[in-house]
Amino acid sequence: MSIDFQQLPHAGIRSLIPYVPGKSIEELAKEKGITDIIKLASNENPLGCSPLALSAIQTMSSHYIATYPSPWNHPLMSKLASYLKVKPEQLFLSNGSDYLFNILLNCFALHTDRHILTHDYAFSTYAIQANSLQIPINSVPIGHNWEVNITDIVNACNQKTGIIFIANPNNPTGVLIQQEEIKYLLEQIPKSTLLVLDEAYYEFAASQLTVNSLDWLEEHPNLVVTRTFSKIYGMAGLRLGYAIANPSIINILKRVQLPFIVNQVALAAAYAAIDDDDFIQSSLKMNNEGMSQLQAGFNELNIKYLPSSCNFLTFDCEEDSMALYNYLLDNGIIVRPLHAYKMNNFIRVTIGTKEQNSRFLTALKNFYL
């Protein structure tokens, strides 16, 4: 008797469509037999990582690598707390932000009668993880201009709402919600409802924000802010994210965390990277210049794009995006089609170096003209 293992998991898992990351350079090289490839698909830092982080990795001792990590006792905790102007007991270190979302769902929504609330075109991992745990998830429609209507989220929230997930700025649209609206949301929702504010792209948008969301933690203990070293710090390959929240929430997360979830290399690199303000400023400068470069190129071609406060632009192909996506692949350029978000006519492109942006725009012109 043969066993159909596909039928053994619960319905939530059986119904899932796996998260598909941006195609890798290695994968495209193998598929197409080409070597001159640029990747503008996953919102990684085209400058690489901080030189200070790289130096810290290169000078690590073999003994340090051979021992199990102890993130809560690592100097990174106090250093990061000081940098953020919070207390160490308000921090939770994680293997990327995705694990943070999973552990929050496990702690505050699983095996309860509560549901999750987000909005259309939000980061797909929220729904994937909620569905994998069979936690009901409700999604609020967004406006025609791709902006999130906070009033609609307030109206959709009730005492049975366990967690609200909002990315600010949002991925994959890049749209920023003003802090006054986030504050209004916090003031309106039940105090038993967690607001998880995913700020993976915070550093790119910080200059546009009038208030740091961390300033609200004392007044609103149901606020959880998540950030990452993957984007501006260029450490996506090391997987290090963190949450800032009320110590009582952090204490719950620590009870159920997997052991040794953050590795030694990531801890050492992050400890060094925090000091590298020159790298951060260089990354921001390159991103601002690249954003202007791509916007000018889109305008020249009359291509519509969404306003972005991130390190990417999402643009409208006005037809199914796969033809352009495949054309770019043939030319050694990896971007991100957004069919997984039911945005079939849209592509998201990461802001690259000046040379990478020029190559992308040239290919775009050749396709359309």
From Swiss-Prot:
Pfam name, any one: Aminotran_1_2
N6-(pyridoxal phosphate)lysine: residues bearing it: K231
Catalysed transformations (reactions): L-histidinol phosphate + 2-oxoglutarate = 3-(imidazol-4-yl)-2-oxopropyl phosphate + L-glutamate
CC cofactor: pyridoxal 5'-phosphate
Record's keyword annotation contains Amino-acid biosynthesis: yes
GO biological process: L-histidine biosynthetic process
Record key words, sorted: Amino-acid biosynthesis, Aminotransferase, Histidine biosynthesis, Pyridoxal phosphate, Transferase
Pathway(s) this gene product operates in, as recorded in its UniProt entry: Amino-acid biosynthesis; L-histidine biosynthesis; L-histidine from 5-phospho-alpha-D-ribose 1-diphosphate: step 7/9
EC number: 2.6.1.9
An example Gene Ontology molecular-function term: histidinol-phosphate transaminase activity
Family, per entry: Belongs to the class-II pyridoxal-phosphate-dependent aminotransferase family. Histidinol-phosphate aminotransferase subfamily.
Assembly behavior: Homodimer.
Designated name of the protein: Histidinol-phosphate aminotransferase 2
Protein source organism: Legionella pneumophila (strain Lens)
Protein's gene: hisC2
